[in-house]
Amino acid sequence: MFITGPDVVKTVTHEEVDKEELGGAYTHSSKSGVTHFMCNTEEETLMSIRELLSFLPSNNMEDAPFTPCSDDIHRRVEALQTVIPEDPNMPYDIKDIIEPVLDNQYFFEVMPHFAKNVVIGFGRLNGRSVGIVANQPAYLAG
């Protein structure tokens, strides 16, 4: 998806770009932020859509679907004791905090290639769907 093609770009800027660089899936999922998901196959696309819809209600009058989980709600996640470094200037991966506390340690990330200093996605806590927005200290200090 682009307004003008590679030939016009070459004429105006003397830069050589192909259609994928100019407006392909990776460009829009990593640079422009137009796309939220990027899939390689139609099957993968349909699976991603199903997964996304599993977190959302069917309409504004319903609750999001409840998914039973067998995780112990009193479980201790020892790894959380060491994720955040003692030095406040050291980076860490926020997903190392998000994933262990979610049901089945599963986090469905939205826009994983765009604005890597922010993490956005869905998960479940005790079977209930939750949306997550967090700074990502591992990139650009969050």
Which residues fall in each region the model found?
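Terminal amphipathic helices with adjacent charged low-complexity linkers/tails
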Residues: 40-98
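Phenylalanine-focused residue identity feature
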Residues: 2, 26-28, 37, 55, ...
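Short capping/connector residues at structural and topological boundaries
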Residues: 6-8, 13-17, 22, 27, ...
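Short acidic (Asp/Glu) and glycine-rich catalytic loops that position anionic groups and cofactors
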Residues: 4-6, 26-33, 72-80, 131-134
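Conserved catalytic cores of soluble enzyme domains
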Residues: 1-61
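Non-catalytic terminal/interface segments that mediate subunit docking, oligomerization
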Residues: 89-142
